[in-house]
């Protein structure tokens, strides 16, 4: 996983994720929904990531699985950037 992407994902999660845990210290594979993120917050996270990375999540990536963990989000961002 790209460390720059991970850092930015954590920053967006801190601002938009409404997590009950600190986004900077949560494990990359921790379930963000169990950490307090709601479906509404995940939409805000997606919008924040689109702004930060100047990307657009394609429809097939708009799934709960994409936003379940820092790792899954970072992998999706990296894949979108490489498309």
Where are these regions (language model features)?
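Short, cationic-aromatic polyanion-contact patches
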Residues: 68-76
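Thiotemplate assembly-line natural product biosynthesis machinery
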Residues: 1-22, 75-83
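Glycine-rich loop motifs involved in handling phospho/adenylate chemistry
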Residues: 26-38, 60-69
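Helix N-cap/coil-helix junction residues
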Residues: 18-19, 37, 55
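Phosphopantetheinylated carrier protein domains
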Residues: 42-66
